[in-house]
Amino acid sequence: MLPLCLTFLSFFLSLGGSFKAVMTKEEADGTTEAAACLFWIFNWTVTLIPLNSLVALAISSPTFFGDKPNGPIFGAKAAEAPTSPPTALKYKYLTSFGSNFGGILTIDLSFYWALGVALTGSK
């Protein structure tokens, strides 16, 4: 029989996969940097995403919707090499307080603030 702490730890890790799998998923999305110190974990993720995914209907030309263009075309006469679409950086900062397994316990401080206001009668 395993001790209770090891049983809980193995159950906790089996819920969403291993911590290494989570880090691998984050690396697939973008660049992840993680730093851990005593009871604090800082996690920074920078993702390079296409700019048009942030804007609704970015491709809204009549040609895209199936219209046939009429009139003169003022484009380039020679074929040009394709370029990459415009991109934007997306930053995500995560600070976890607790153990090295991430923020297991989340404390909603607004509840305690409202409770303190109700008990003391001050605003």
UniProtKB/Swiss-Prot annotation:
Leader peptide range in chain numbering: 1-24
More about this protein: Partially overlaps SYF1.
Keyword Lipid metabolism annotated: no
Record membrane topology: Multi-pass membrane protein
Cellular component terms (Gene Ontology): membrane
Organism phylogeny: Eukaryota, Fungi, Dikarya, Ascomycota, Saccharomycotina
Residue intervals passing through the bilayer: 39-59, 101-121
Cellular compartments annotated: Membrane
Key words, A-Z: Membrane, Signal, Transmembrane, Transmembrane helix
Protein name: Putative uncharacterized protein YDR417C
Organism from which the protein derives: Saccharomyces cerevisiae (strain ATCC 204508 / S288c) (Baker's yeast)
